């Protein structure tokens, strides 16, 4: 298969670490070949403070311009594996190609699971924007987030800390014991904690 015949997938994010983690996961999956074009535009304001209301610097203008670059480069779909996923509708409108967040990719996979209750372990910004809650409604899923003490523990999980995987596994077990059928990790940092 010639490179021009392969799917071209843009990978867009404000957080280079999230893009790197996403690319590692795609590589580990193997499967069909696709051309992946990662782009993390310079000087994009951090999405987290903006989504939490702690900053007035909107990341959307730079992200919109980057999505347009990816579409102009031949990408037929764009994945957004970080907090910037909350802007997928606006990015799709700007780029003219589908722009998918982690929520858009994960939640349809959970339809039909037991009682369809899912707990989302994510950053404070994703939680504040209720990115998963809004998407879950489209699929008839009940989406929840950990309570404040558990959310605070999530902030302590770092890939470089030896205890992080154990803490994260305990949080997952707690969320399952609370009646959730599934637990979704929506953070490059949380996913990387399992890699060490």
Residue ranges of predicted features:
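Non-catalytic structural scaffold of enzyme domains
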Residues: 1-196
């Amino acid at each position: 298969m010639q490179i021009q015949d392969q799917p071209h997938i843009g990978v867009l994010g404000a957080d280079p670490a999230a893009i790197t983690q996403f690319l590692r996961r795609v590589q580990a999956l193997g499967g069909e070949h696709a051309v992946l074009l990662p782009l993390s535009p310079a000087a994009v304001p951090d999405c987290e403070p903006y989504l939490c209301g702690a900053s007035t610097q909107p990341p959307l203008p730079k992200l919109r311009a980057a999505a347009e670059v990816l579409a102009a480069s031949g990408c037929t779909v764009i994945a957004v594996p970080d907090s910037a996923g909350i802007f997928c509708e606006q990015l799709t409108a700007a780029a003219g190609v589908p722009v998918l967040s982690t929520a858009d990719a994960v939640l349809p996979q959970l339809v039909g699971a037991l009682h369809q209750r899912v707990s989302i372990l994510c950053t404070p910004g994703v939680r504040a924007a209720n990115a998963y809650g809004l998407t879950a409604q489209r699929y008839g899923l009940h989406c929840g987030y950990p309570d404040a003490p558990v959310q605070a523990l999530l902030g302590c999980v770092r890939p470089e800390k030896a205890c992080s995987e154990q803490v994260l596994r305990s949080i997952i077990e707690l969320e399952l014991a609370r009646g959730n059928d599934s637990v979704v990790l929506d953070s490059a940092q949380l996913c990387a904690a399992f890699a060490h």
